[in-house]
Regions:
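Sec-dependent bacterial lipoprotein signal peptides
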Residues: 1-6
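An aromatic- and glycine-enriched ligand-binding surface/loop that stacks and positions planar moieties
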Residues: 8-68, 137, 161, 169-170, ...
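Conserved, well-structured interaction surfaces
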Residues: 28-45, 65-134, 149-162, 168-182, ...
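Long, intrinsically disordered, low-complexity segments
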Residues: 88, 163, 246-302, 385, ...
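A glycine-rich, coil/turn loop motif that links secondary-structure elements
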Residues: 111-117, 180-192, 242-244, 435-438
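C-terminal substrate/ligand-recognition segments
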Residues: 320-423
């Protein structure tokens, strides 16, 4: 696995302080430590929290994590503290500082290019992510300077994306396809290709669904980039979906293309305690910080490929049977046996009538009646110190990017069903061969596959933004299980617990506001429309 112990030591000290004292950036080992220090800037497990920004999940605390809860409900403003979680010019400074120091180093060219590829990948990803949230943003290139010092105005979003693409192109050129030994887990050529494919998919979506313009060349490029990842012949789907989200899979699977790296007892995260309610797992500890919505749970298909509203297989008394296999591997579901602190397995029963620790609105009980198994190890003794890596890109996404892009510009291409069917086969679902050429239906299928495959991986929010469906799916409450405990738990016609009200204003919510704190320091920053 990627050795980050040097990184952890390095982060104990200020790298700028080290540089100014002329005690750093002398050797190849120094450069590697400097680059390692950038890896924690990659998106990590907190992206699981951010699935609450979509229609997949709700935060149990209406305020939540410095205002993330406000964003999730659509009641945030320019003063909301959580905006700074994505407005990351301190990260841009650190990345450019590292790049600037590298350029002046005399080390082996092959190593120098590899380090540059890693740095430029992280730089491209940071700018891409900020542009997705804020649209037009200041663009600082090559030389490290603070945003306040530069006092730059905002550059057009496309100019920012073009610069990000320039950087990811160099990453593709410089990065190796694979690593060995302690370097396994570092950023690869495949990861860089995935980032670029992701960017082109996003640009194509905005051009088509927001601007109503032809985007054929953008879709074509997204498909071509995904195909290049496929043609590397390095990746495949794991047979067991659940395995991917356990520590045993860390750098030990064929599907993950890039992940945020964690280490037992050194670099850890708290997803198990956040994903669990009270009373489950070997410790019984759980905060139920975020809960899946009824809409998400109900959207999983039956094994005949139909919805629960259409299929004759659906049984309200046994609603989790004959469903997409990912359903039981992603969620704790009412009535399904779950591990308890005494080692027994008893049904998870969150309805308040049962007075269990996991009951709705109990402290640590959640608000919808559903909880997460994904990224949650119920046998873990230290539930606030998980070391399961957090995936940024998986081969399943490669296949679905390929299928989505092909469907938009060449809907009769048989490669579409080839790609989609692989993902569906693992989930125990039938193929979609009969839908080839039905662009609208295939579009819906692919979108649902993305929703179910990437729960908790912070894909859904960006998807509903780029598809321009956020104004529909986020303008409705997030519901939970049925209120009447005497009705079948799968009876979707009954009144449900209201988890949270939500709102989405299409006149402004497709972009976040520029943080007021940033505008106070830089008067050249204008605000986004209607904020």
């Amino acid at each position: 696995m990627l050795t980050l112990s040097g990184c952890a030591d390095f982060l104990d000290r200020d790298p700028l302080e080290q540089a100014s004292a002329n005690t750093f950036w002398k050797t190849e080992a120094d450069v590697e430590k400097g680059v390692n220090a950038l890896y924690p800037l990659l998106p990590g497990e907190r992206d699981f929290w951010r699935d609450c920004e979509s229609d997949n999940s709700l935060m149990t605390n209406s305020w939540g994590e410095n205002g993330l809860g406000y964003i999730c409900q659509g009641i945030h403003n320019a003063a909301t503290g959580y905006l700074s979680e994505e407005w990351k010019y301190d990260h841009i400074y650190r990345i450019l500082y590292c790049l600037d120091k590298l350029q002046g180093m005399e080390i082996k060219e092959e190593k120098k290019q590899r380090f540059e590829g890693e740095i430029r990948f992280i730089l491209a990803l940071k700018y891409y992510r900020m542009a997705r949230h804020f649209g037009d943003i200041p663009l600082i290139k090559e030389k490290p300077v603070s945003l306040e010092e530069a006092a730059l105005p905002r550059s057009p979003k496309q100019e920012v994306l073009d610069y990000a693409i320039e950087n990811v192109n160099k990453a593709i050129e410089y990065l190796p396809e694979t690593y060995s030994g302690d370097d396994v887990g570092r950023i690869t050529k495949g990861a860089a290709l995935m980032l670029k494919a992701d960017m082109y998919l996003d640009m194509a979506s905005y051009k088509k669904f927001h601007q109503g313009e032809e985007a054929k060349e953008l879709w074509k490029e997204a498909a071509s980039l995904a195909k290049k990842v496929i043609d590397l012949n390095l990746y495949g789907l794991e047979n067991d979906f659940a395995f991917l989200f356990k520590a045993a899979a860390n750098n030990n699977n064929k599907e993950v293309i890039l992940a945020h790296q964690y280490m037992e007892d050194e670099l850890t995260h708290m997803l198990p305690v956040l994903c669990s309610p009270s009373g489950v797992g070997v410790t019984g500890r759980g905060w139920a910080s975020f809960c899946p919505t009824r809409d998400l749970v109900d959207s999983y298909e039956m094994t005949d490929g139909k919805t629960i509203y259409e299929s004759s297989l659906y049984d309200m008394e046994h609603p989790w049977e004959n469903r997409d296999a990912r359903l039981k591997k992603t969620f704790m579901l009412p009535g399904v046996d779950i591990l308890r602190p005494d080692g027994s397995y008893t049904p998870y029963m969150p309805h308040p009538a049962y007075n269990n620790p996991e009951r709705i609105n109990n402290e640590g009980g959640g608000i919808t009646g559903y909880m997460y198994l994904k990224y949650n190890d119920l046998e873990l003794e230290k539930v606030d110190a998980s070391w399961t890596n957090f995936s940024l890109y998986r081969y399943a996404e490669t296949l679905l990017i390929y299928a989505e892009a092909l469907n938009e510009y060449e809907p009769y291409n048989a490669e579409i069903v080839w790609a989609v069917n692989q993902v569906r086969k693992r989930a125990g679902l039938p193929g979609v061969d009969s839908q080839l050429g039905n662009q609208e239906r295939m579009r819906t299928i692919i979108r649902e596959e993305r929703r179910h495959e990437f729960v908790g991986e912070h894909k859904r929010y960006f998807d509903i933004l780029r598809w321009k469906t956020a104004e529909v799916v986020l303008n409705q409450p997030g519901y939970g299980i049925n209120k009447d405990e005497h009705t079948a738990i799968g009876d979707y016609t009954q009144e449900k617990f209201l988890g949270q009200e939500r709102t989405f204003d299409p006149q402004k919510h497709y972009l976040w506001p520029i943080p007021q704190s940033a505008r106070d320091k830089n008067p050249n920053l204008t605000q986004n429309p209607n904020w």
